[in-house]
């Protein structure tokens, strides 16, 4: 029993140490310095989801913070301030072809995803900077696109997640889900134009 207790205590101490190291790394990023990258388990696990529309792949890479009994909206995530829409490094969205988001055009590429939450309306920001740590170094000058959407009450999601819903031949709704909130935004693709371009490229080769 004593040896088992020692093992459990040692494991708890090790996990606590890892959390402190991760917290230290994040604090250094907040201060603008670049810490040595540590390959350690994250408290907020990495997640990724991909949806294909026609020939176009849309991939969201993010980290998944947990509610953990906390008051999220307006507290952990303040209203009126830029939020990284996840945890740790930038949440990123990659489009393999040009798309529209909420009807507004956005060229193919990888973008840092940020939001500005509010009670009744959120701003979703696609930034040309996709490699920063969260939103701490966010610069409005690097915006590629901003759209406004409305949040909706939803079933509880203990860990933050992104999903694709209402998938159609030329569109899908990407949704951020966390706590009891869902934030949907529609992504559209000109499938005919993408297919025509693909066929032309194949004929050239």
Regions found by a protein language model. Name each.
Residues 15-20:
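Hydrophobic core
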């Amino acid at each position: 029993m004593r040896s088992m207790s020692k093992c459990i205590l040692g494991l708890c101490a090790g996990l606590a140490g890892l959390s402190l190291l991760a917290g230290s790394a994040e604090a250094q990023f907040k201060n603008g310095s670049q810490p040595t990258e540590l390959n350690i388990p994250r408290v907020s696990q990495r997640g990724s989801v991909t949806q294909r529309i026609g020939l176009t792949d849309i991939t969201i890479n993010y980290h998944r913070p947990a509610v953990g009994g906390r008051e999220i909206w307006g507290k952990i995530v303040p209203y009126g301030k830029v939020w990284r829409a996840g945890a740790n490094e930038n949440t990123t969205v990659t489009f393999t072809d040009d798309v529209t988001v909420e009807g507004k055009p956005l060229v193919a590429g990888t973008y840092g995803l940020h939001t500005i939450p509010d009670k009744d309306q959120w701003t979703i920001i696609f930034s040309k900077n996709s490699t920063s740590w969260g939103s701490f170094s966010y610069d409005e000058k690097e915006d590629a696109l901003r759209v406004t959407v409305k949040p909706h009450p939803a079933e509880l999601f203990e860990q933050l997640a992104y999903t694709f819903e209402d998938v159609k031949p030329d569109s899908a709704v990407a949704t951020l889900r966390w706590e009891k909130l869902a934030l949907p935004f529609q992504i559209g693709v000109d499938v005919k134009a993408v297919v025509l371009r693909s066929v032309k490229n194949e004929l050239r080769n």
